């Protein structure tokens, strides 16, 4: 597999490295101007949410060494100054959350990167969701986006429902775990005042572009979806509530059967299915993009249903970043 560089060693950057280790992918370089190599070792080894790293990690001669493999460490603020070529990094994961446009992310190419994958939604880069629209990828694309964790949960389920029952319109709510952008106690937050309220104390209504982004990866649904979020005081794992009006009438059992068929077939490993009496912590470190749970959903009639799907918004997403790179490499 092509060699990977990671820019930004935050929540997603570190978990992309864990996912790469699990999947046998080769990470050869990490850049973060705010964390030295010894602190990288500490942050990678210990994780309050996903637990201690099960392999070995150390700092040796300025390198980050994971399971015996040396990883070059850079500390550049400007992506244009990162010498990815010197470390052999070809595919760069842009996980700072800062350089999310094609223009900004393209600066990695100056340092020798061949392709850039933005681990966030992008205003102008082509967006891809594994299991949904990878066939739209073209080798001439230099910068792409892996969309958001919520879009990765929503899109595979929406694809199955639309392919089989025709979606007329959708309202989505994601009940979303806290993220690093939130405040531990009340503080200022620019234009969106309540986003600055204490994350541990509140259920906070928030905006999300995840539903509209589905229209970019499934063009047939463009303009048919929108949604919002509730940020809740849990550290990880979120859940999508999809309220759908169908074009073709179907019983709830028929919908369940089609989702299970997809989960066991073409979307295996991306879309999961469970009949268990689950709660959010049961999905910690789950590698699926989306796990459909029929017991939590309801049907009003054969054309109006509420569908529920869980996702580890950190680790499931990080696994898809590696899967996207693997797919790109197979086509480049």
UniProtKB/Swiss-Prot annotation:
SUPFAM superfamilies: Glyceraldehyde-3-phosphate dehydrogenase-like, C-terminal domain (SSF55347), NAD(P)-binding Rossmann-fold domains (SSF51735)
Principal location class: cytoplasm
Annotated CDD domains: GAPDH_I_C, GAPDH_I_N
EC number: 1.2.1.12
Residues where NAD(+) binds: 11-12, 32, 77, 313
Keyword annotations from UniProtKB, A to Z: Cytoplasm, Glycolysis, NAD, Oxidoreductase
Gene Ontology molecular function, alphabetical: glyceraldehyde-3-phosphate dehydrogenase (NAD+) (phosphorylating) activity; NAD binding; NADP binding
GO biological process, one term: glucose metabolic process
Residues annotated as site: Activates thiol group during catalysis: 176
The protein's annotated pathway: Carbohydrate degradation; glycolysis; pyruvate from D-glyceraldehyde 3-phosphate: step 1/5
Subcellular location field: Cytoplasm
GO CC field: cytoplasm; cytosol; microtubule cytoskeleton
Pfam families named among the record's database cross-references: Gp_dh_C (PF02800), Gp_dh_N (PF00044)
Enzyme class label: oxidoreductase
Catalytic activity as recorded in UniProt: D-glyceraldehyde 3-phosphate + phosphate + NAD(+) = (2R)-3-phospho-glyceroyl phosphate + NADH + H(+)
Record: active site: 149
InterPro entries with a match to the protein in the record: GlycerAld/Erythrose_P_DH (IPR020831), GlycerAld_3-P_DH_AS (IPR020830), GlycerAld_3-P_DH_cat (IPR020829), GlycerAld_3-P_DH_NAD(P)-bd (IPR020828), Glyceraldehyde-3-P_DH_1 (IPR006424), NAD(P)-bd_dom_sf (IPR036291)
Binding site for D-glyceraldehyde 3-phosphate: 148-150, 179, 208-209, 231
Subunit structure: Homotetramer.
NCBIfam families: GAPDH-I
Family: Belongs to the glyceraldehyde-3-phosphate dehydrogenase family.
Name of the featured protein: Glyceraldehyde-3-phosphate dehydrogenase
